Structures are given as structure tokens and as C-alpha cells.
């Protein structure tokens, strides 16, 4: 049995935002007792260019096989979801949640800063530091993981939701070989009015093994969401007007450019509500 090291999560009221805002208000679930027996949970804090980060790491028992690694953004909230979603009857992956030294489920300002492309306009002024965050992953996160764990460098998976999914696109456009498999869950394609899309083709210079794009059904059909308010519907429609491409079109374009891409619409789920399902779909690929 493995020990459970400190995991200082605060539990918030259970609710998902019914809008396309980047930070779902989501209760952080405790890691299930059964998974605590299968994983050792570790934390490692980093300071990079005066910014503070925390890795949450789920370490499976040692085997003779190299480990498949899953890296997820928004680690404070989505790391425990990923650990709980692992199929215990299949080979266990190493799970790395990249988060912040914070008790918040979602560090709103930090994730906007770190996960987004540079863009003009007052609405985007607090973002645009994806290049810095990518360097942090390249220079600190990946070397630390590769030094301490025997991972299979041909089986490294990325998961990001909302702004995290947008950051996945940034990596694909600038350093696609950093991971081999990408899950872009409900990517915030409205950011910068779509100005982040490359002007050259193909958009991805080195094709990854696979890209999975997921989207909650109600994100594209918000008028069918039984719980949506008029204010939320207006905001979603405003976001739609800001984008130049939707998730379906993104998948189609990437396929036409020669990439292996799958698109999954998650039934009866909105932006925040689709997170657990998207993580499960990602893990099905990780553990196949």
C-alpha cells in the first residue's frame, strides 16, 4: 500500500458554471480511498521567473514497463478527477497535474495569464504569456519528471480544458513534439477573436500521434440547456461571435492537414459540466 502525502484541497460548493467563461466553479473531489491504495500522491513546488507553481503527481507501483505519462493543466482541480477516473484493471499511468500554490480550484488570473496567446484588446490584456508557461514546462516540469520517473517518451499525453485546451493548441503550433497525444477539451477558440490561428499551412509542423477534441453538447446548442439563464445565453452568443472557427471546424481543418484527429460531443453537458467526461475519454486513450 502506498502512502498518501499532503494534498491540501479545500472543498467548494458543487456547481458548474453554465457559461463559456474559462474557469468553471467546481468542487474539488477527494481522491477515492481505492485510488489512494494504488497510487502514491506527491507534490513538488516550483518558482519560475517569479511565478509559483505546484505539481501534483500520482505515482503507480514500479513495474518492468516504462510508464505512460498524462500531464493535465488546472492541476489543483483536475488532477484528482483524473486519478479517480483511472481504470484500475489496466496499466496505471503516471499522472502529473500542473497547478498553482493555491487552495483555489481554479487560479483565475494565473491560468488566463499562462494558458493564452498574445492578443490585442482590453479584454485580453491579462493574458498572453503562453510562451513563458511553455518554457516552464520545457525547462522545469518535463526534466523533473524524466529525472525521477521511468517514463515512455513515446507515450506522453496532454490534457487541457477551456483555456487549457487553448494552451494545447499553442503547444501544437509551437512545440508539437513536446507530447505525443493531445486532448483539447472545450478549447477557448474565442480568445483574441481567433487571431491566434496560424497564417501558414500546415498549422502543425510535426504531426502528433493523435489529437482528441471534446465539446459539451450544450456549448454549441445552449438554447437547449434546461438550466441556462438569459444572461448566460447572451454571454455564450457573444463568445460565439468573437471566434472565427468552432471546435468542429478546427477538427475538420486539422484532419485535412493530415493529422489524426477525433471529435467527441459530450451529451447533455455544458462547458464546465463536460470536464469529467472529457478526462474519462482522455484516459481511455491513455490506458488503451
Regions found by a protein language model. Give the residues of each.
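N-terminal signal peptide c-region/cleavage motif recognized by signal peptidases
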Residues: 17-19
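A conserved short beta-strand
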Residues: 178-187
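Alpha/beta-hydrolase fold nucleophile elbow
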Residues: 150-161, 182
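Short glycine-enriched nucleophile-adjacent loop
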Residues: 165-176
